[in-house]
């Protein structure tokens, strides 16, 4: 356990940031799963809207430092491929 006041504060700050990051990562996963279920339903218009939401969530996660930009790009590419396969 930390004895210095600033170290104690850092522990508190890290705990709150960890919780926030977990929440954002969880909502990101939920958004991606929603897109995948819509794609399985084969509804093109809903899939486009769900892709837009998922891409926005991925970009936000990158800007907040939740995930790496390459992971977001890779995920968006895979989701776009599924959307394009649905259109074809």
From Swiss-Prot:
Pfam families: Ribosomal_S20p. InterPro entries: Ribosomal_bS20, Ribosomal_bS20_sf. Belongs to the bacterial ribosomal protein bS20 family. Keywords: Ribonucleoprotein, Ribosomal protein, RNA-binding, rRNA-binding. Binds directly to 16S ribosomal RNA. GO terms for cellular component: cytosol; small ribosomal subunit. GO terms for molecular function: small ribosomal subunit rRNA binding; structural constituent of ribosome. This is Small ribosomal subunit protein bS20. PANTHER family: 30S RIBOSOMAL PROTEIN S20, SMALL RIBOSOMAL SUBUNIT PROTEIN BS20C. NCBIfam families: S20 (TIGR00029). The gene is rpsT. Gene3D superfamilies: Ribosomal protein S20. GO terms for biological process: translation.
